[in-house]
């Protein structure tokens, strides 16, 4: 059995590979058509103009769905491993909410380009990155709380390093973007897709976009740490029948049917 066939380990793998492919395909298309500059454009700038906008939107929406599925499986796994510890239960619920909000932000970024509805696009980006960062932080705390009985110390330290990486990238991005957009660098800076080294604010722009890409890769690394954990879990769906036919008016006992959800039983 291949590693991705064990449990639900294919979910975080698919999430990272698909999202990375989304960024790369839209980047290559935008560069080929000269819609953006090759030197570190904003990720969403590569999905601003058609036809790459269509590809970016569809693929990023699918990535958001994969993200919600991965976050939900992680929630169920932590809940099953720690059904009675109050602190872990609260943190786990908080992580679920933060993760879903982050995926909602990702979907907003996919569907509302900055050239169409800038405010909605920015709100989606802030939601995706901020809630995603807090989600990583909460999951790292959970990893600390569950070591060494359930989680190894190595997993905790790897996730902690990824959270620090994410935090440094987020701080750099927020600082430089705040200076860039609050300064007088031109009225069209918000919608600007092409930058030259001699343009005012060019250095701030490059630092901001580099931090955005860096932050995204810290997310990729964090979700990849779920692969081994997800090899140890399978979800099942249960169908509860209320009658022998679809027209029974009186409930009668019927044997329920149980099948695996997306994966075979882990042996």
Curated annotation (Swiss-Prot):
Q: Keyword Transmembrane, does the record have it?
A: yes
> How does this protein lie in the membrane?
Multi-pass membrane protein
Is Ribosomal protein among the key words of this record? Answer: no
Q: Which family does it belong to?
A: Belongs to the DRAM/TMEM150 family.
Q: Which PANTHER family match?
A: DNA DAMAGE-REGULATED AUTOPHAGY MODULATOR PROTEIN 2 (PTHR21324:SF10), FASTING-INDUCIBLE INTEGRAL MEMBRANE PROTEIN TM6P1-RELATED (PTHR21324)
Q: Which InterPro entries match?
A: DRAM/TMEM150_Autophagy_Mod, Frag1/DRAM/Sfk1
Q: Mind telling me what this protein is named?
A: DNA damage-regulated autophagy modulator protein 2
GO CC annotations on file: apical plasma membrane; cytoplasm; Golgi apparatus; lysosomal membrane; lysosome; photoreceptor inner segment
* Keywords from the UniProt entry: Apoptosis, Autophagy, Cell membrane, Lysosome, Membrane, Transmembrane, Transmembrane helix
What function does the entry list?
Plays a role in the initiation of autophagy. In the retina, might be involved in the process of photoreceptor cells renewal and recycling to preserve visual function. Induces apoptotic cell death when coexpressed with DRAM1.
């Amino acid at each position: 059995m291949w590693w991705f066939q064990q449990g639900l380990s294919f979910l975080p793998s698919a999430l990272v590979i698909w999202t990375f492919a989304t960024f790369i395909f839209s980047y290559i298309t935008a560069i080929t058509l000269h819609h953006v500059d090759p030197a570190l454009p904003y990720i969403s700038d590569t999905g601003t103009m058609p036809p790459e906008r269509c590809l970016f939107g569809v693929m990023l929406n699918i990535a958001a769905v994969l993200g919600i599925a991965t976050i939900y499986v992680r929630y169920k796994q932590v809940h099953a491993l720690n059904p009675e510890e109050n602190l872990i239960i609260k943190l786990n619920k908080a992580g679920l909410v933060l993760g879903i909000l982050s995926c909602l932000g990702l979907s907003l970024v996919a569907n509302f380009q900055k050239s169409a509805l800038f405010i909605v696009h920015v709100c989606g980006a802030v939601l995706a990155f901020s809630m995603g960062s807090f989600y990583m932080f909460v999951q790292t705390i959970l990893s600390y709380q569950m070591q060494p009985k359930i989680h190894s110390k190595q997993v905790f330290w790897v996730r902690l390093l990824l959270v620090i990486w994410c935090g440094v990238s987020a701080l750099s991005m927020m600082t430089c973007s705040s200076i860039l957009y609050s300064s007088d660098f031109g009225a069209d800076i918000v919608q600007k897709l092409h930058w030259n080294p001699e343009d005012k604010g060019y250095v701030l722009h490059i630092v901001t976009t580099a931090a955005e890409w860096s932050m995204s890769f810290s997310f990729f690394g964090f979700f990849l740490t779920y692969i081994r954990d997800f090899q140890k879990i399978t979800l099942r769906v249960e169908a509860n029948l209320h009658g022998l036919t679809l027209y029974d008016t009186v409930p009668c006992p019927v044997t329920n049917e149980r099948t695996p959800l997306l994966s075979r039983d882990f042996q």
